[in-house]
Amino acid sequence: EIIISSPAKSAFCYFNNEEMTEKKFYKGWLYTGDVGTWDENEFVTVSGRRDDMIVSAGENIYPAQIEAVLNEHPKVAESAVIGIPDKLRGEVVAAYVVAKDPSLTVEELKEHCTHSPMLSSYKWPRAYHIVDELPHTATGKKIHYIMRERAEEDLKNGLLKRK
């Protein structure tokens, strides 16, 4: 997680939300909730949000990596990856996919992921749902927390197909 400190820390707070301020600040450091890496040139690359990280059988999985692989498929317009509850692993990867081509099947997606050199087997989606659209913010970012809520309903209704 990316954490920062500044002499102006006292200027940062959650307005009228003391609980959140205490949660995000610790001993003068702001815990941003962003996950990233620091390279040899001292640049920080943000790779996702801590809240979006999936923990499956003790492995940390970042949705952006799986989304990038899914989005390489020629019949995929875009995708969103989230974690769904699993009794054995804690969470497993679920993929929501918007198709460019209506002939796209779950089997094609599964085959694409399992043959990708970019994904280890623990990162393969275990459930898929082909949808018409994904929720986005006004700036175009996918809203993963809405997808997690949607997945709860889809699991209850049998719409997420486990593979």
Question: Which residue ranges define each predicted feature?
Answer:
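AMP-binding/adenylate-forming catalytic domain of the ANL superfamily
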Residues: 118-142, 158-163
